[in-house]
Structure formats: C-alpha cells, structure tokens
Amino acid sequence: MTLLLLRHATAGHRRPGVGEAEDRLRPLDGRGRRQASALPELYADFGVTRLLTSPYFRCRESVEPLARALALPVEERSELAEGVGEAEIWALVAEFDRATAVFCTHGDVLGLLLGEEPEKGSTWVVEPGGDRRLVRGAYLPPPA
C-alpha cells in the first residue's frame, strides 16, 4: 500500500477574525488552482485507487482535477480535518492495507504523521510501516 499525503494547494491566508465555519469554505487561490490542475500528471504513475479529503473546501478543490482525470469519487473524511487527534488519523491510516490512496489534508494533520508540516501543495509518498510508523519513500514539491 502507498499513501500520497497531500497538503492542500495554496488558498491564501486565514483572515484575522474569521471563524472556523467560514474558513472551511476558503477556496484555492490562482496558484492553488494551477497546483491542483497539475496533480493528474504528477500522480500518473502511482496507480491511485482512492481519493480521501478533509471536508474543507480547499482540500476538496485540490483533488477535484485528479478525481475527474481518474474517474474516482472523492471521499470526505472527518479524520482529515484540521484539529483531528493523533489516534483518529492513525486509525484512518490503518484502514488502508491494500489501496494506493491520496489523503488531502492540512499542515497540522500532516505534522502528526510526519513530524513536520510540509509546504502547501506538496506531497509525501509513504508506505505505512505499522505501529504508527511511516516509511518515507519520496517528497514531491508543490507543482509550479
């Protein structure tokens, strides 16, 4: 099994004073839309069979071009939303023993898995190693 851990494409910055409910609807900016459009080509050789995303609009928007290109449904999962607990995200990872899946999520969630928050639009290609471990295979910088 391979996981492609995608931090959503660029979506500008959270505006001061904006609550979580409104921030969930923040769309990608122009650069983010270009990054999302490049994912089908970037991921072409991985054989992706599942697309999972945070329910936040910027995450869903990041994977929509890939979903269209691969004719795959996008599965919204609360375990990929901002503020998720470590136990929840590792339980989701444990569900994937045979799929090649994209998890589109946020910096804080990726920080729980990777120990760092990668750049927006970037991808870590990893293999779960059991016992809450990931074997890092490759880092893919954000598409230009």
Segments predicted by a language model, with ranges:
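Active-site-adjacent alpha-helix immediately C-terminal to a catalytic or transition-state-stabilizing loop
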Residues: 87-136
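Short, solvent-exposed aromatic-acidic interface loops
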Residues: 135-144
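Active-site-proximal alpha-helix that buttresses catalytic centers in soluble enzyme cores
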Residues: 1-79, 83-88, 116-124, 144
